[in-house]
UniProtKB/Swiss-Prot annotation:
Pathway: Amino-acid biosynthesis; L-tryptophan biosynthesis; L-tryptophan from chorismate: step 3/5
GO biological process, one term: L-tryptophan biosynthetic process
UniProt record similarity statement: Belongs to the TrpF family.
Species: Bordetella bronchiseptica (strain ATCC BAA-588 / NCTC 13252 / RB50) (Alcaligenes bronchisepticus)
Cross-referenced Gene3D superfamilies: Aldolase class I
Record's protein name: N-(5'-phosphoribosyl)anthranilate isomerase
Listed InterPro entries: Aldolase_TIM, PRAI_dom, RibuloseP-bd_barrel, TrpF_fam
N-terminal signal peptide: none
Keyword annotations: Amino-acid biosynthesis, Aromatic amino acid biosynthesis, Isomerase, Tryptophan biosynthesis
Catalytic activity, EC: 5.3.1.24
Pfam families for this protein: PRAI (PF00697)
Catalysed reaction, written as an equation: N-(5-phospho-beta-D-ribosyl)anthranilate = 1-(2-carboxyphenylamino)-1-deoxy-D-ribulose 5-phosphate
Gene designation per UniProt: trpF
GO function terms (MF aspect): phosphoribosylanthranilate isomerase activity
Keyword presence, Iron-sulfur: no
Amino acid sequence: MRTRVKICGLTREQDIASAVQAGADAIGFVFYPASKRHVDPVRAAQLRREVPAFVDVVALFVNPRPDEVQAVLDHVAPDLLQFHGDETPQDCGRYGRRYLRAFRAGAPGLDSAAGLAAACRQYADAAGWLFDSYSAGYGGSGQGFDHGLLAGVQADPASRAIVLAGGLHPGNVADAVRAVRPWALDVSSGVEDAPGVKSADKIRQLMAAIKSVDQVAR
């Protein structure tokens, strides 16, 4: 199976081009004002025009108001929503759009395999479950986590697609793919020169490392 890849936190046209040319399956825009990678709907709409057919656009939110999500839907027309805060199943499903639900593995209540699996099951209609590491703030932490916490999710026959995040970069992504065998990866800071400024070289290195593992697994 080929591991899908989303490059998140894009803010520049040239970085979208780098991600697409390297073979990314999806790109992500962050609509969380506290993030250094935040873009507003108008800017995201401009960037979205650089995304070709068959590359998905994902809109990331953290505890948004409904009108904030609607503005993104109207301006950007994302293919997928991603909720990275404390959103309930009702919050995530109210827009009638496909969505990813992110879980911060290691957070209180999510610090055991059983606890994490139980939380995930509340979002059975999600298109995928994304797993990031826990930190005091919201959004991506840029740090890894104990992948053993995913054991309950991996053993669940009703599991949704597993999307792995958390400190992934060209130097560790191959080991992460071998250990977890996720459906997809979500990478941001691990392919950056600075927050919101992606490195074309790091993106290429990341994609090459993933491809090398996928080829062996066939």
